[in-house]
């Protein structure tokens, strides 16, 4: 019996059936790695969903950012409405890591804002992995960070069953020990209340209320309640209450951890004093002893993750346990856009260690803090059972690992061909391009233009605007929310031409684009490498009349390879259409409104305007202060994202000042 039940309004077509059969065959043979080389718009997600259904293994789908993970999760939930499709990304709305800048002697404390809903989804993912096998978890790369110990997390869960006798007081103590808090007035996720013989709690992994009714010390009934109406939704025979936090440390292990921290502290202080670093020694001793006192008293301290090696009982250098360790041994990994995700996977460890090294050297953290880290690439691959790489342009490493198991998916279900490619000289390229743009505007089609430099993109935008073309420029400083809005405006025809330096990022699903123009196509480098050219040309692959113009005076190896690969795909597609009598049909895709509906997009003041408003904050009406705080928080998050810690700290202090102003009134 199949664990997964795929539901789709269409059947596999084109070369999807062949790709599905080959993937399933390769995985069932026990091959560790295989690659799905799928052209843009060929329905790779459907192919993966069909493969998951036939293989029937718990699956982790890895994406390289939150937005792409959300899109994949939504698609897979539509394909598997009866199964557990979970979403696991970093739960921080805003995260500024602890940092020290030696040049200015500036220490910045860790500051973070946790998204409660995402935290609930993370708990829901681990709960599903414990309770069922028909699970697909769509995760960002943050899943390689430590997540407590699955064995301790499961051991700490509280099992309740109708008819079971249990001491109510002991049950309350058990709930507190797994990080639930009592609140008889405001029942929220991670809280419980007791009224007479009725216990109500909201578990960490969902927003429904669990009601446990007692008759003496015997459990009489267990029900799910609607959190708003209080109506009974479902009666249960038994239920497991999992801890409110993933990091669970038993009392005996906590004391052993504290003793280990003390021993390391003594050794490190001696080492620093021998080096003449008296300030660093004093700083480290004071901070660590304060943390130890908190750990012993309340079992928690700010920055507790820096002691995770001791709390989890790991040896020095031993990899942390993460989401992957919650999967059973026979799990399946799918890496989407593998040509981007795998390099990101390799870089996570090095970036984390560089920041920690500075903190350790200057006495802010013990050397063991370096073990609070993401997995190294080699540690990650040691945990992988079987893997499918998915990309239109897989990297050499993926191809090598697949050892011949590279499955192509070239045919689009709609019959649309890869774009025609034209090479034109750079002399007079701008005026030539202007003529092409005007033709597309007449047909109500859209144009993408990619340049090599920001300056050229700006100049080109200005040039076209002066000639009456509705054009916008997409640059790296635009936030992801604004970016989605700009792309939506392009699709809806508010402007006709989009210019940018790197238009390879995910989310450029634009069926209205019929022309992609690549300027300076013969300048070798990352943005004009073979894979980058294929990806960029593919932006026009969703339009029946898709074309790509490469402006160049020479033919580089990358250009030749990209054109040969595109022509090879076109020939396969044309032969398939001719053989089956298929007439290409326009690709219809979901508008970005589905994403925008989840985002509160409002016009934001720029940094300079915010400075002026903040300077006059004392004269600002009280009802306007929360709005200013919200906009300052946006700037703080952007600064932290760019690793501008001092700037982010400045915004944090201003936000606190404004909150104090509100409280003072």
Curated annotation (Swiss-Prot):
Q: Where is motif Beta-hairpin found?
A: 91-114
Locate the UVR domain: which residues?
626-661
Q: Which residues form the Helicase C-terminal domain?
A: 429-595
Q: Which residues bind ATP?
A: 38-45
The keyword DNA damage is annotated on this UniProt entry:
yes
Keywords attached to this entry? ATP-binding, Cytoplasm, DNA damage, DNA excision, DNA repair, Excision nuclease, Helicase, Hydrolase, Nucleotide-binding, SOS response
- The regions listed as transmembrane in this protein's record are none
Q: Name one GO molecular function term.
A: excinuclease ABC activity
Where is this gene product found? Cytoplasm
User: Quick check: keyword Glycoprotein in the entry?
Assistant: no
Domain of life, per the record?
Answer: Bacteria
Q: How does it assemble?
A: Forms a heterotetramer with UvrA during the search for lesions. Interacts with UvrC in an incision complex.
The UniProt similarity line reads:
Belongs to the UvrB family.
Q: What does this protein do?
A: The UvrABC repair system catalyzes the recognition and processing of DNA lesions. A damage recognition complex composed of 2 UvrA and 2 UvrB subunits scans DNA for abnormalities. Upon binding of the UvrA(2)B(2) complex to a putative damaged site, the DNA wraps around one UvrB monomer. DNA wrap is dependent on ATP binding by UvrB and probably causes local melting of the DNA helix, facilitating insertion of UvrB beta-hairpin between the DNA strands. Then UvrB probes one DNA strand for the presence of a lesion.
* Identification of the protein by name: UvrABC system protein B
